[in-house]
Amino acid sequence: MSTGITYDEDRKTQLIAQYESVREVVNAEAKNVHVNENASKILLLVVSKLKPASDIQILYDHGVREFGENYVQELIEKAKLLPDDIKWHFIGGLQTNKCKDLAKVPNLYSVETIDSLKKAKKLNESRAKFQPDCNPILCNVQINTSHEDQKSGLNNEAEIFEVIDFFLSEECKYIKLNGLMTIGSWNVSHEDSKENRDFATLVEWKKKIDAKFGTSLKLSMGMSADFREAIRQGTAEVRIGTDIFGARPPKNEARII
């Protein structure tokens, strides 16, 4: 698919170098954890929020296919402009009234921030209505491992189990349970300690849920500041933006084209 999106050659050189630098570190850490296994089993999710479509096109032309966005409208607009074999991941705070708009995106691959039964049901219902022939959306349940009030996510066992129950029910056909996701606290992510306790908490939730429901959940944890430790503690995915694209502009100055 030709998008007609052009880009600067200097920016291309810079972005590819930065992407490959991060990829190299991810692979090196993964090989230490997954001995004799393919290090590419760790997904490097490229977080492209507030970055122009031209930056995404550069990395797409380099072979990258999975990108993460934090804002519903931005994801929708970029999905219309960019190749339709991109796998879009929504990783921002999810509002129930935005589930319908998200579900309309045919190549929406994943929603990583399900934090209530109501949102899970609304997303399933909306996908069934607007894109019933597309693949089910892979979903992560967001866990608030740091118990910070300003953070989204569940930490109540009954509520978590209720959401998992729905995903495994006959009713839930258009979205699919993939794993658990967390955003650790800033302070913990910047501590010079051997183990990130927020990540350790997510690992414990995985063990508890897998034991109760017979699942085999994947973990999504780790961003630019703490992805190395996340890999060591068992994540299947790291979400990296700044280390690849550089600093983000203020939201009111960001442009899609």
From Swiss-Prot:
Modified residues (N6-(pyridoxal phosphate)lysine): 49
Main location: cytoplasm
GO annotation, cellular component aspect: cytoplasm; nucleus
Single GO term (MF): pyridoxal phosphate binding
CDD domains reported for this sequence: PLPDE_III_YBL036c_euk
Keyword Cytoplasm: yes
Annotated positions of the N-acetylserine modification: 2
InterPro entries: Ala_racemase_N, PLP-binding_barrel, PyrdxlP_homeostasis
Sorted UniProt keywords: Acetylation, Cytoplasm, Nucleus, Pyridoxal phosphate
Miscellaneous notes: Present with 4890 molecules/cell in log phase SD medium.
Homology family: Belongs to the pyridoxal phosphate-binding protein YggS/PROSC family.
Its biological purpose: Pyridoxal 5'-phosphate (PLP)-binding protein, which may be involved in intracellular homeostatic regulation of pyridoxal 5'-phosphate (PLP), the active form of vitamin B6.
Protein's recorded name: Pyridoxal phosphate homeostasis protein
Source organism per UniProt: Saccharomyces cerevisiae (strain ATCC 204508 / S288c)
